[in-house]
């Protein structure tokens, strides 16, 4: 119904309440090109409001809508051509990729109890054990021989290619004591003593965070042994006295019965507590596998004191695996599997290993405990590092795990710790808790608490210039932390994370237990080589696809449209950043073309076309009638012809893939979309500010994410039944949450600029209308809260919607995430030429990794 241009009041009754609008004399200037004015075509649906034009009242002025002036697109053809690298996928690259995939699959399939390197320290303790037959020989002579054969050139024992003074000094001290006990290797002992004398002082130069676990317990105890054996060591060095004092202080803080009350990390260092341990009581805390917290050294010390057969069985088990040496702890089966899965996912190569990942996670889940897990399946002491990693990965893969497991690791002050009784936290464990906290479900307050606590800790670590870690020596842990804080889960797209982690990943990273150790199934060159080759290969295909999209854009005449934003590369970046696998090329193309039309038509309906012409456009889509184009202005002719031809082609391809006609489905999707655009145009024309609920009901559709997803889903490689389509359809909670979160993040970053251009309806403004007593700042805060809660619910829908094919679930969820990225700091689509999005596009599509 058109409002008449008379001086008389008119009333349109559509509900129970009345709102005043001003008179309109003539037609409303839409601020478009000369001679074009927006007619007041109004279509009112059902609702509680009625709008009236009230004579003599002017409750708000009707501003001239400001013509949209968009920055020109940055990614023109000549820019894209100038950035095209010389890289092409060579046959040798394809062959190498296949070889690496096979080797890594075999790596996953061969995972047992954990692969790791020798620990000279633990091997020395096992070598101390006298033969059980009473002969004056070692029970494990092969371990003693290993010590004799593996002294380094500088006289130390330890990891040859990674010098850590704490680690070298501790291992060297253990080895020279063992050799002295067995009265062998005099030359090695003297070289070891010389190393100790010349290098011990370097410990003072190392960060406290690099001090191995339990060092202040076992090192002073071994020094006491060395002194009793007459070894000439510099016992009076200041740092040695400081370590002894730390040991005494720690033991004084230890409640007398804590050692025996429940399993703690003290079980890991019993060799350093021999003078205070009640050996009968301690046996109650022995693990099922016979070890004490998987530590060969601790277990060896207990065996020498008790002769316990299960201890001996454990040591025999470890030596059967490793031959003539032992690691610093074993097994490491849960740790190895979780971190291997996390590594291939972060490097972006997980799509090659779906079966292997499932097998690994099935194994972990079979040993999941509601109190948490440790690094091994029979480890009685859970830690927050493995638990948080397990909670996040298992949840995202659809396993039923509760966030309540984190309560095990929260103290009375609300702070989170790694182990029971621990006073120091590490960067890597807090980083993993932080990453975990972002996959929260609604109402999980423990996840919110974990997020706030770990963000505070990690930001402080960065500000202090540290970000060094007590559990790992990584290539660039600082870079990992910076990425996680800047791009948390809901704005971290897979290709961007892969790019970042390829740069931060260390194939030679080491971990810190009681000694330094390596995990070759977690850190290795094969993962990195495959990640680089695969990234560059996928990027090459993406560049070719983008060129095809550019040709489509130009041949359709869209470059002639002066009223809209040309953002072809930025829009293509969206699906390429998450649905990146080569087999989804058609889906990416459909996603990009559909998205481009949502931008064109949004700009058309928002501020360019008259309402009469918009009605004609909508009717043309509804009737799918090209003949109506003759009644349209030239720019709208270009729009509709391109629209008509493109979606006819898409529908034909969809028919082939789905085995049924999909054109009517696509039409209906677009009808709903254009209705939402039209309603916004009507509101804008009369300066109508709806209630928040009324606004969101329409705006969650007008954001157009649903239209993009519902059409693109036809090309995910799955046959989509009506039942499946209903689960991601307009009435589904899943799709609604995607649209809601996309709309809210858009509004929070653009409402002020759009208000200056004459727009009156946004989530913030509509909420303020419902609650006139609150400030704009309070309204904005409330909208953010709504969005955060909706993102939590979106997590749950994504994880639990297992009736929906994985690729369709990804399509919905990742589309919500890309919106969080684009509107992270502002309007990343409109202003992408001078924002970080430009760098993301470049890194994702044009810049190969070296």
Curated annotation (Swiss-Prot):
Gene3D superfamilies: 1.50.10.160, Farnesyl Diphosphate Synthase, Terpene synthase, N-terminal domain
Motif DXDD motif: positions: 383-386
Positions bound to Mg(2+) 1: 602, 606
Tissues with expression: Expressed in young tissues such as flushing buds and green bark tissues. Lower levels in mature needles and bark.
List of residues binding Mg(2+) 4: 383, 385
Assigned GO CC terms: chloroplast
The EC number(s) this enzyme carries: 4.2.3.32, 4.2.3.132, 5.5.1.12
Ligand binding (Mg(2+) 3): 746, 750, 754
GO annotation (BP), single: diterpenoid biosynthetic process
Induction, as annotated: By methyl jasmonate.
GO function terms (MF aspect): copalyl diphosphate synthase activity; levopimaradiene synthase activity; magnesium ion binding; terpene synthase activity
Comment block on domains: The Asp-Xaa-Asp-Asp (DXDD) motif is important for the catalytic activity in the class II active site relevant for the cyclization of GGPP. The Asp-Asp-Xaa-Xaa-Asp/Glu (DDXXD/E) motif is important for the catalytic activity in the class I active site, presumably through binding to Mg(2+).
Protein name: Bifunctional levopimaradiene synthase, chloroplastic
Species per Swiss-Prot/TrEMBL record: Pinus taeda
GN (gene name): LPS
């Amino acid at each position: 119904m058109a409002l008449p241009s008379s001086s008389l009041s008119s009333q349109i009754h559509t509900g129970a309440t009345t709102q005043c609008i001003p008179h309109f004399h003539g037609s409303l200037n839409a601020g478009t090109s000369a001679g074009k004015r927006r007619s007041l075509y109004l279509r009112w649906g059902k609702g509680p409001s009625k709008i009236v034009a009230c004579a003599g009242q002017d409750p708000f002025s009707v501003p001239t809508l400001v013509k949209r002036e968009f920055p020109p697109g940055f990614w023109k053809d000549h820019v894209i051509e100038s950035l095209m690298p010389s890289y092409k996928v060579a046959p040798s690259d394809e062959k190498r990729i296949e070889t690496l995939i096979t080797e890594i699959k075999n790596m996953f399939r061969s995972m047992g109890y954990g692969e790791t390197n020798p620990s000279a320290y633990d091997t020395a303790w096992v070598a101390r054990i006298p033969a059980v037959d009473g002969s004056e020989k070692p029970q494990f002579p092969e371990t003693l021989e290993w010590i004799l054969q593996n002294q380094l050139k500088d006289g130390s024992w330890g990891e040859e290619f990674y010098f850590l003074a704490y680690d070298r000094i501790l291992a060297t001290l253990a080895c020279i004591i063992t050799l002295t006990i067995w009265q062998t290797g005099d030359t090695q002992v003297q070289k070891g003593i010389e190393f100790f004398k010349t290098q011990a002082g370097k410990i003072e130069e190392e960060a406290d965070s690099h001090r191995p676990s339990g060092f202040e317990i076992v090192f002073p105890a071994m020094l006491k042994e060395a002194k009793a054996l007459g070894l000439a060591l510099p016992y009076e060095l200041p740092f040695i006295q400081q370590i002894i004092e730390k040991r005494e202080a720690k033991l004084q803080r230890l409640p007398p019965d804590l050692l025996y009350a429940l399993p703690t990390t003290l079980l890991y260092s019993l060799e350093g507590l021999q003078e205070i341990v009640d050996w009968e009581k301690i046996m109650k805390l022995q693990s099922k596998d016979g070890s004490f917290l998987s530590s060969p050294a601790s277990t060896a010390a207990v065996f020498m004191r008790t002769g316990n057969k299960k201890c001996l069985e454990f040591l025999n088990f470890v030596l059967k695996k490793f031959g003539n040496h032992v690691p610093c702890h074993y097994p490491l089966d849960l740790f190895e599997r979780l971190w291997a899965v996390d590594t291939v996912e972060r490097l972006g190569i997980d799509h090659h290993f779906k079966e292997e990942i499932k097998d690994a996670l099935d194994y972990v889940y079979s040993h999941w405990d509601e109190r948490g897990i440790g690094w091994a399946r029979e480890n009685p002491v859970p830690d927050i590092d493995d638990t948080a990693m397990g909670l996040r990965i298992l949840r995202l893969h659809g396993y039923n795990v509760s966030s309540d497991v984190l309560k095990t690791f929260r103290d009375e002050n609300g702070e989170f710790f790694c182990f029971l009784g621990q006073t120091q936290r590490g960067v890597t464990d807090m980083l993993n808790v932080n990453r975990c906290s972002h996959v929260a479900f609604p109402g999980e307050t423990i996840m919110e608490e974990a997020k706030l606590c770990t963000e505070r800790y990690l930001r402080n670590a960065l500000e202090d210039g540290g970000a060094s870690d007590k559990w790992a020596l990584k290539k660039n842990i600082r870079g990992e932390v910076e990425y996680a804080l800047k791009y948390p889960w809901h704005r971290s797209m897979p290709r961007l994370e892969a790019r970042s982690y390829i740069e931060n990943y260390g194939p030679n990273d080491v971990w810190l237990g009681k000694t330094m150790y390596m995990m070759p199934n977690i850190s290795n060159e094969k993962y990195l080589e495959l990640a680089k080759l695969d990234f560059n290969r996928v990027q090459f295909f993406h560049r070719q696809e983008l060129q095809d999209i550019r040709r489509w854009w130009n041949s359709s005449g869209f470059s002639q449209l002066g009223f809209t934003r040309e953002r072809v590369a930025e829009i293509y970046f969206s699906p390429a950043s998450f649905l990146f696998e080569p087999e989804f090329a058609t889906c990416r193309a459909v996603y990009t073309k559909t998205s481009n039309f949502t931008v064109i038509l949004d700009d058309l309906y928002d501020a360019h076309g008259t309402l009469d012409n918009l009605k004609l456009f909508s009717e043309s889509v509804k009737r799918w009638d090209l003949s109506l184009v003759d009644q349209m202005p030239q720019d709208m002719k270009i729009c509709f012809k391109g629209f008509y031809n493109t979606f006819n082609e898409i529908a034909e391809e969809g028919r082939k893939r789905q085995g049924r006609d999909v054109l009517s489905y696509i039409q209906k999707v677009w009808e709903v979309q254009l209705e939402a655009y039209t309603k916004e145009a009507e509101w804008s024309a009369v300066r109508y500010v709806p209630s928040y609920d009324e606004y969101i009901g329409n705006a969650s559709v007008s954001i157009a994410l649903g239209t993009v997803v519902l059409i693109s889903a036809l090309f995910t490689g799955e046959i989509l039944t009506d039942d499946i389509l209903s689960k991601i359809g307009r009435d589904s909670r899943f799709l609604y949450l995607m649209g809601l979160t996309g709309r809210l993040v858009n509004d929070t970053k653009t409402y002020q600029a759009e208000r200056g251009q004459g727009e009156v309806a946004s989530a913030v403004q509509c909420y303020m209308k419902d609650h006139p007593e609150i400030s704009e700042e309070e309204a904005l805060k409330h909208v953010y809260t709504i969005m955060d809660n909706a993102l939590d619910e979106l997590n749950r829908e994504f994880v639990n919607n297992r009736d929906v094919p994985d690729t369709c679930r990804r399509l919905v969820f990742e589309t919500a995430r890309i919106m969080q990225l684009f509107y992270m700091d502002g309007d990343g689509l409109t202003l992408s030429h001078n924002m970080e999005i430009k760098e993301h596009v470049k890194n994702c599509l044009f810049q190969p990794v070296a």
